[in-house]
Curated annotation (Swiss-Prot):
Molecular-function GO term, any one: metal ion binding
Assigned GO CC terms: cytosol
Domain TRAM: 388-450
Domain annotation MTTase N-terminal: ranges: 14-132
Gene: miaB
S-S pairs: none
Protein name: tRNA-2-methylthio-N(6)-dimethylallyladenosine synthase
Primary enzyme class: transferase
Record-listed [4Fe-4S] cluster 1 binding positions: C23, C59, C93
Organism ancestry: Bacteria, Bacillati, Bacillota, Clostridia, Eubacteriales
A Pfam family the protein falls into: Radical_SAM
Amino acid sequence: MNEILNTKDINAIGEFFIETWGCQMNEEDSEKLSGMLKKEGYIRTEERENADVIIFNTCCVRENAELKVYGNLGILKGLKSKNPNLIIAVTGCMMQQKGMAETIKKKFPFVDIIIGTHNLHNFPNYLNEVKKKDTSILKIQEKEDSIIENMPIDRKNSMKAFVTIMYGCNNFCTYCIVPYVRGRERSRTPENIEDEIKKLISEGYKEITLLGQNVNSYGKDLEPKVTFADLLERVNTIDGLERVRFMTSHPKDLTDDVIEAIAKCDKLCEQIHLPVQSGSSEILKKMNRHYDREKYLDVVSKIKKLIPNVALSTDIIVGFPGETEKDFEETLSLVKEVEYDSAFTFLYSIRKGTPAAKFEDQVPEDVKHKRFNRLVEVVNEISAKKNKAYEGKIEEVLVEGTSKNDENKLMGRTRTGKLVNFIGDKDSIGKLVNVKIIKANSFSLTGEEI
């Protein structure tokens, strides 16, 4: 494995601001950017106006994320005029798209650094070069390198942490741009993953979320071969670790071995995010998802049989090209059959460079929105019903801090990922406590520590 390039010659030290759009992988990338800059002596600020360096870590999964970047870059023009020494950097998946970096440079010539996802680890070097030579940098690395280990990381949370176990994706769903911007699947060795988790535990962390675009593909590129089920069992034996979660799973790769590992490993939380995208086999085929409705429901049945108290969540795309009313009704019926605890629902958004962008049978926007509203209504009704079942139960909660809505209450999550606001002792923050659920709300639970 490569080691991170180290620089110690940045002249003037100042404050930096990072804004992040997108998934948990992007969040962890931003934590690494922050870690690298803090190692160089920079201080993080939450105010753009105070920053000497502003970094936008971008997402391109949906058009809305890109529009936010354009809008925010426009706002920075005024800041740059007031402070010509301000350094503005743009990185992330959006920049990795073909021609996008050049487009950003043309529209926003005041941007100083534009890099992609594959050379993020060299950011301190690029920053140093810009400051020394009074120049701008546009460097998009087309091909991914081997995994960079031992990068400094500045984690936002002091008790829960993301640990990336693999990068990239080999699935090429017809609507998705991730394989083009994140590269092919590359797995970290189990030893490196274990070492990172052990270090986190020594720093007081209680809960780890194993991250990957498709964690169920973990280890296929390693020699000797290691499966995701193997990794889960290894991680479960680490002393001091309280909880383990993972995301995201691809249904086609969620094997019986993985389901069995979740069921028998006591530190594995009873929560699985299993994106279905559509309940129609016809649409799933057009999406290139490599499973049909029957296969997906079979996987769900196995999960519920071995993990009866499991909380399932999913992703659903509404209005994929060619989606008929019949296809949409099949999605609704699948949602009702599975009874998800929660679902992330999205309107289909054309992504340039993906096969689906060229499909001719695009669904009208008004039809998409009507279907979307119908779906959300069903999802919310089921979520409320699932939450209601917690009333009167005693649940283990990892206490994360005070409630955002009531400073007199604490907040945390159950093993199934339910948000709980409850009356309790502030000395419990950072600990696992038992909470009696006294009331179920639409998107959270209310309780009291016992």
